[in-house]
């Protein structure tokens, strides 16, 4: 049974501009340590921004699927996006983001945009 769905679209250039303006202050506030470490494999600043844009979209899609928003008991860092050994995107949850049910995540990007779609189900 589907408990919730969420989708979010993020402009990679917007994330790139936020990183340029705020640097680690932005990434440390929004992303988990693992997400930040995973981003270090990208030497190109735009590729790194694309990595973060997809994860930001996934976090937003997840809270939309919950029917909440950030700051209502769920913080962005409570949601960590990574890939399983086969490359499938996964969400790990901590703190206020922990909820009953299973999470399915799909992410993609094209040009300057990243999109994520989340379903919560029993």
From Swiss-Prot:
Enzyme class, UniProt record, top EC level: transferase
Assigned EC number: 2.7.8.7
Assigned GO CC terms: cytosol
Main location: cytoplasm
GO molecular function annotations of the record: holo-[acyl-carrier-protein] synthase activity; magnesium ion binding
Domain of life per record: Bacteria
Reaction it catalyzes: apo-[ACP] + CoA = holo-[ACP] + adenosine 3',5'-bisphosphate + H(+)
Alphabetical UniProt keywords: Cytoplasm, Fatty acid biosynthesis, Fatty acid metabolism, Lipid biosynthesis, Lipid metabolism, Magnesium, Metal-binding, Transferase
Alphabetized InterPro entries for the sequence: 4-PPantetheinyl_Trfase_dom, 4-PPantetheinyl_Trfase_dom_sf, ACPS, P-Pant_transferase_sf, Ppantetheine-prot_Trfase_dom
Localization terms from the record: Cytoplasm
SUPFAM superfamilies listed in its UniProt record: 4'-phosphopantetheinyl transferase (SSF56214)
Annotated positions binding Mg(2+): 8, 60
Known function: Transfers the 4'-phosphopantetheine moiety from coenzyme A to a Ser of acyl-carrier-protein.
UniProt record similarity statement: Belongs to the P-Pant transferase superfamily. AcpS family.
Name of the protein described by the UniProt record: Holo-[acyl-carrier-protein] synthase
Taxonomic source organism: Anaplasma phagocytophilum (strain HZ)
